[in-house]
Structure formats: structure tokens, C-alpha cells
């Protein structure tokens, strides 16, 4: 009962997960790092036809390329990007990893899959070539910049959104981790079961919910 009460609120559960991962970061990071976690910024430019740019589109594309030679990606994104979600944040699009390219991904990233794929192939501080993305809303050209690849810095990011996405990505990268955390806190709270049947039900619940093996 005490453990259930402790875990009822998602906020407390998140706290519990965060504390455990912070303490055991070097032990749990490998599976997550294999998914190439990073934070990225983007520049988006809408076009009518990527293969036949209009004079206006050609000029804008050229202006962006020239600006990137002299100015920071953030400044250029703020001045030129047509992405309504990120232009006012200096192009910052947040957290992505290799799972962000999957349609069944748990990622909340709004960065198109092709752009994420390009970002995964870049090092920190690098900018991609132009990437063409066609969706139901039309065709756009993107440039993506990798802002951070250090896993510890991403996990401890000042942005709650980024640090929360990193937390859930770590939990998702190892199916048994949530169970290990729960088991660790159960031992700390010194949970006692009055009978074997209750213990069996609890173990079954944990295994089903968190993927742990007793």
C-alpha cells in the first residue's frame, strides 16, 4: 500500500525515476546513447516546387546560405525561418534521437523524420545541407543544426521539456529499468507483504507494467 501510494502520482513517479537515473547515470546511459540523443535547431523555408524554385524562393534560399556563412544559426533562424513553432525560439526544436524517425515513436518531436535522420549523421555544431520534405501541408526545405550531443548535459538541460523527453527516452531505451527503479524504492521503503499471494500479485503487476523479471 505504501509503495502504491508513493507511485500513484505521475509527478512523484517522475521524481523517483529522475533521482535514480541521476544517481546511476553512468550505469543506465549506454542503451540511450546508442540512440544518438541530441538537441537540434532548424530553419524551414516553404516552397511550391523544390525542383523548380521561383525567383523569390531562389533569392531567399541564397540569402539564408549567405547569412549562415557570417552569422550564428540561431540568428539566421530567427530572421528567416518559416517554422511557426521554432522561429521565435531562435530555431530551437528541442530533443530528438533515432527513435524520433519512427511513426510509432513515443517522441513528441515535431521535426520531420528526414530532418532527424540528417541530424543523427551530424556532430555537435554541424549544419546539414538543404533537406526537402513533402507532407500533406506542402513542400518545405530544411536546414538542421546540432546544438548538443552530450548525454549528461541533455539529461540535465535547463529546459524542462528537453530534460523530461530525455528522462522518458532513457526509460524507454531499457525495458527493465522502470522495474529496477521501482524495486530499488520498494527495498528502501522496506515494503513487507503479509502473504505470498499478495507478493505474487505485486510481482505480476510490476512485470506486466514495467517489464521487470523477478
Language-model features and meaning:
Residues 1-51, 55, 106-214:
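PPIase-associated folding chaperone regions across multiple families
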Residues 56-64:
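Well-ordered, non-membrane alpha-helical segments in soluble/globular domains
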Residues 63-114, 156-157:
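Peptidyl-prolyl cis-trans isomerase
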Amino acid at each position: 500500500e505504501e509503495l502504491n501510494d508513493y507511485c500513484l502520482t505521475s509527478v512523484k513517479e517522475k521524481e523517483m525515476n529522475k533521482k535514480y537515473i541521476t544517481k546511476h547515470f553512468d550505469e543506465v546511459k549506454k542503451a540511450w546513447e546508442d540512440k544518438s540523443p541530441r538537441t537540434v535547431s532548424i530553419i524551414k523555408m516553404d516552397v511550391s516546387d523544390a525542383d523548380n524554385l521561383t525567383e523569390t524562393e531562389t533569392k531567399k534560399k541564397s540569402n539564408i546560405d549567405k547569412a549562415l556563412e557570417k552569422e550564428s544559426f540561431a540568428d539566421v533562424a530567427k530572421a528567416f525561418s518559416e517554422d511557426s513553432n521554432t522561429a521565435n525560439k531562435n530555431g530551437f526544436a528541442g530533443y530528438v534521437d533515432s527513435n524520433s524517425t519512427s511513426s510509432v515513436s513515443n517522441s513528441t518531436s515535431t521535426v520531420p523524420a528526414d530532418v532527424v535522420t540528417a541530424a543523427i549523421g551530424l556532430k555537435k555544431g554541424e549544419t546539414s545541407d538543404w533537406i526537402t520534405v513533402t507532407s500533406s501541408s506542402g513542400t518545405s526545405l530544411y536546414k538542421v543544426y546540432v546544438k548538443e550531443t552530450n548525454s549528461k548535459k541533455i539529461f540535465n538541460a535547463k529546459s524542462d521539456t528537453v530534460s523530461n523527453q530525455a528522462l522518458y527516452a532513457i526509460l524507454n531505451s531499457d525495458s527493465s529499468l522502470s522495474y529496477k527503479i521501482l524495486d530499488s524504492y520498494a527495498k528502501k521503503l522496506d515494503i513487507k507483504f503479509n502473504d505470498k499471494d499478495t507478493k505474487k500479485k505485486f510481482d505480476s503487476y510490476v512485470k506486466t507494467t514495467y517489464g521487470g523479471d523477478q
